[in-house]
């Protein structure tokens, strides 16, 4: 229990960056990350024998996702002139995958981990709500001056559908997981507390003001609505979705009117995204070395980092905006294949054992992978490590 509390404290300290805290110093964040990764390595080293004695269904996948990016150091040096030391610093976040092994050492329960994810989701919701009323006095999720200049903004936040859009660096990952979990609980036993939490989480997804996230969450809920045993469960799911659809239809103009107008008038933005995908895809496949290993991940103050900044400033080309194509540019084809192999194992190989809410999360993030890569950034590494550990708990339990 003490170790679990220590883990919780460390993750909470670093998670202030996950909420994009305005006063959080990037340099301090880097040093915090180095210390956390060093600690993870040390714990794994001293518990190596305990780890190898366990059956870890996703060990090979974790190792690939953690180590394949290291292969980009060579092409990044040869093609992009970024030194191996700078590349290693830029790739340090990938070692957060080590938490998968630490969870198998500490063995927290699924209930405890879901509680922690739920707390994070509720914190996100309250930040979204409170800052709508306190802006411009806010602590999280605004652009700095450089980002405002790059995006041509007059304010440090975007306004969509009449609401402020705060970028909390979570992409709805905590919220989606708990949303899908609560949905599953509602299907088995309709209780007021589940209903209230579900509505709060659905509102939080909407307040992200990210069209892809809203659509993929709703589509996934519909796709999985009729999964499950028992006619009562399916009838309850149908009735709930029916009433939810009526509410959405009545308030459609207020909730989504500006989204529809923005989508209709965003031809230029869509064209830029297509051109960006063509550019990064072409520059990846032209060289066999970068095709398989990628161009590497840039460190901000390097020639390579400034080159990508110039692409963003002058052309609006961001690798992160084109999903797995952009991450193939960073880490190569082998890395992207490793993600799809992982998704295949969760959804098909171990489908009988994996909890439905985890399958829903994998489907939801996969549906938008052409625009938002599912394994992008520290918080995704952390959350996926937790979910894969929970999958292992169910797989091990089924074999007893």
What does each model-identified segment do?
Residues 3-6, 10-262, 279-282, 313-400:
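Hydrophobic transmembrane helix bundles of membrane-integrated enzymes that assemble
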Residues 263-331:
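Long extracytoplasmic/lumenal interhelical loops at the membrane interface
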């Amino acid at each position: 229990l003490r170790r679990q509390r220590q883990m919780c404290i460390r993750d909470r300290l670093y998670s202030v960056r996950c909420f994009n805290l305005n006063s959080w110093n990037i340099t301090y964040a880097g040093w915090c990350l180095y210390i956390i990764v060093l600690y993870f390595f040390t714990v794994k080293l001293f518990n190596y024998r305990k780890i190898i004695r366990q059956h870890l269904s996703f060990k090979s996948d974790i190792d690939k996702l953690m180590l394949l990016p290291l292969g980009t150091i060579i092409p990044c040096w040869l093609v992009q002139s970024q030194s191996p030391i700078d590349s290693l610093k830029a790739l340090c976040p990938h070692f957060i995958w080590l938490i998968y092994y630490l969870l198998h050492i500490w063995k927290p329960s699924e209930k405890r981990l879901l509680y922690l994810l739920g707390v994070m989701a509720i914190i996100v919701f309250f930040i979204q709500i409170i800052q709508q009323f306190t802006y411009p006095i806010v602590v999280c999720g605004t652009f700095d001056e450089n980002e405002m200049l790059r995006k041509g903004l007059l304010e440090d936040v975007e306004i969509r559908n009449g609401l402020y859009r705060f970028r909390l660096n979570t992409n709805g990952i905590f919220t989606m997981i708990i949303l899908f979990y609560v949905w599953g609980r509602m299907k088995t036993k309709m209780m007021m507390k589940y209903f209230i939490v579900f509505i709060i989480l659905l509102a939080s997804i909407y307040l992200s003001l990210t069209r892809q996230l809203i659509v993929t969450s709703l589509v996934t809920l519909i796709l999985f609505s009729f999964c499950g045993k028992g006619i009562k469960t399916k009838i309850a799911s149908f009735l709930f979705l029916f009433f939810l659809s009526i509410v959405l239809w009545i308030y459609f103009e207020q909730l989504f009117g500006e989204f529809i107008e923005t989508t209709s008038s965003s031809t230029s933005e869509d064209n830029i995204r297509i051109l960006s995908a063509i550019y990064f895809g072409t520059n990846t496949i032209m060289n066999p070395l970068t095709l398989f290993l990628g161009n590497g991940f840039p460190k901000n103050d390097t020639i390579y980092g400034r080159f990508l900044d110039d692409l963003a400033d002058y052309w609006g080309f961001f690798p992160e905006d084109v999903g797995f194509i952009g991450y193939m540019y960073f880490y190569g084809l082998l890395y992207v294949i490793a993600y799809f192999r992982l998704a295949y194992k969760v959804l098909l190989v171990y489908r009988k054992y994996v909890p439905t809410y985890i399958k829903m999360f994998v489907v939801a993030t996969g549906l938008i992978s052409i625009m938002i890569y599912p394994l992008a950034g520290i918080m995704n590494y952390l959350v996926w490590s937790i979910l894969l550990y929970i999958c292992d708990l169910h797989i091990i339990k089924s074999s007893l």
